[in-house]
Amino acid sequence: FAELLFPDVTKTPEYYEEKYPYRKLPNKAEVTRLAPSPTGFIHLGNLYSALTDERLAHRNGGKFYLRIEDTDAKRTVEGAVDTVINVLRYFNIEFDEGAGYPDDDERNAYGPYYQTQRVDIYHVYAKSLVERGLAYPCFCTEEELEEVRKQQEEAKELTGYYGKYATCRNLSDEEIEANIKAGKPYVLRLRSQGSPDKEIVFVDEIKGEVKLPENIHDIVLLKKDGIPTYHFAHAIDDHLMRTTVVVRGGEWLASAPIHYELFHVLGFKMPKYAHTAHLMKFDEETGGKRKLSKRKDPELSLDYYRKDGYHPYTMKVYLMTLLNSNFEEWHEKFPDKDINEFPFSLDKMSTSGALFDKDKLHNICKNELSKLSEDELYDFLYDWAEENEPEKKNIWFADKEKMLGILRLYMGIGMKRRRKDFMYAKQIFEMIGYFFDMEDTQEKDEFRMDTEDVKTILNEYLSMYNHEDDNSEWFNKLKAIADKHGYASDMKAYKANPEAFKGNVSDIAEVIRIAVTGKANTPDLWSIVHVMGEAQMRDKIQKVLA
């Protein structure tokens, strides 16, 4: 009855084996893939997996491709594929082939890469299984299946369609033909060869040797509309696209017996599997670890990092520390080497769950951004502002030399040691916003002196200010203001007898600093004023005095 089920299928598995030959790749090269559902939501776990796949493939000249598992129409979101490609491209992860390339492009050689466009292929292999007695149509209704499930639960038996519960498994050819001609809807099921008292054994590339019970379920291969289930499509796609390593989350380990059986009944060589541990975070409420959650953790979404402007390289450095336990030591030893030179290995990946630590991410951001030149950081900030703050961009980047001067100042370029204040674009613009008169939209630090003392100091500062003064001359004038109002100009004298003074010259500088920047802590104040310009500085102080 294979012809009855698939009257329009004329091709054979051999046709596709010839159409998609084994790839000619260097020794030890791997073929990996990212295979998301087009839901429109791409998260940190996807980036974590994509980086794993990309590093595995490219360490020895292999291929990394994008496949879209879009068989669930209810979850498909328009534009989701472009989102996946563009978000990963932002993080400098590019696919060698796959979804997103034109049909006639050589990077589409093993396509199509959308599962909904591969239904004819799945039907060829489904027909072959039917011909060999390894698959059969099941006419059970949802109500009948639900009744079986209830019986199994009451009897405290394994739930599912197997053994004596697989009633359609034993239908005669005549019964099958009569049901089909009567127009009864059906799914196509695998006739499982598994035994409940046997195990499968395979070596997981991360977890090591794994033993699991054989699959005994007659799983659905094709749904009533002819669309394949994930399990069936996965096996055929990974075989024909010549995937050598499947990297996926640990939650898929329980499905390994199903995939193991499918690869064997289809006559395919099974790829290597690497089941990654979940990304975890410390839960302050419970004091323990938990999985990152879409509902609880906004930082799970990659849009979070794009919109706030995390530099893609800093994210990759951080994720590499989670992926391989020996990466940090290597990166400290070779700080100027491209991280793609790191000898990435699956056996250095965590088996218990990598702990996502935002503080550590920010420390890495500070360290990596401090290595950039002011021009590199300028270009990154410009691109981020163009996409995320187009109106403010025209203000921030109206004067390129001014912006470069600000970046040099905050990065400590020209100093003995680079400053490490910057973490991500949004935070950077908040930090330097006062240069563009944006401090009114930000929270300001409070003056620690009373209002009259603040006004007195600011008025005297303006009256004696000369923009031609060098740093030393400028600071001597601050000392003079300090002496006049009972503040120590000599720090040694202040430390020796602090009770003799109202404070010291740094308190005078703080008043001016807060008036000019809105912040008590900034880089060198004299340098700030000279990047800003005298007119803007005076205007800011006059606003405070008013």
Predicted regions and their residues:
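Short amphipathic alpha-helical segments and their helix-coil junctions
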Residues: 29-33, 65, 298-299, 338-346, ...
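Charged substrate- and nucleic-acid-binding regions of tRNA-handling and nucleotidyl-transfer enzymes
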Residues: 479, 483-546
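Residue-level signal for inorganic ion chemistry
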Residues: 53, 84, 129, 133, ...
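A generic secondary-structure signal for well-formed alpha-helical elements
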Residues: 88-95, 130-137, 149, 156, ...
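Catalytic adenosine-cofactor/nucleotide-binding cores of aminoacyl-tRNA synthetases and other
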Residues: 266-448, 517-546
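Glycine- and acidic
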Residues: 32-39, 65-70, 240-246, 299-301, ...
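Active-site cores that bind ATP or allylic diphosphates and position pyrophosphate for catalysis
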Residues: 128, 136-275, 280-292, 301, ...
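N-terminal Rossmann-like or analogous alpha/beta NTP/dinucleotide-binding catalytic cores
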Residues: 1-154, 254-268, 314
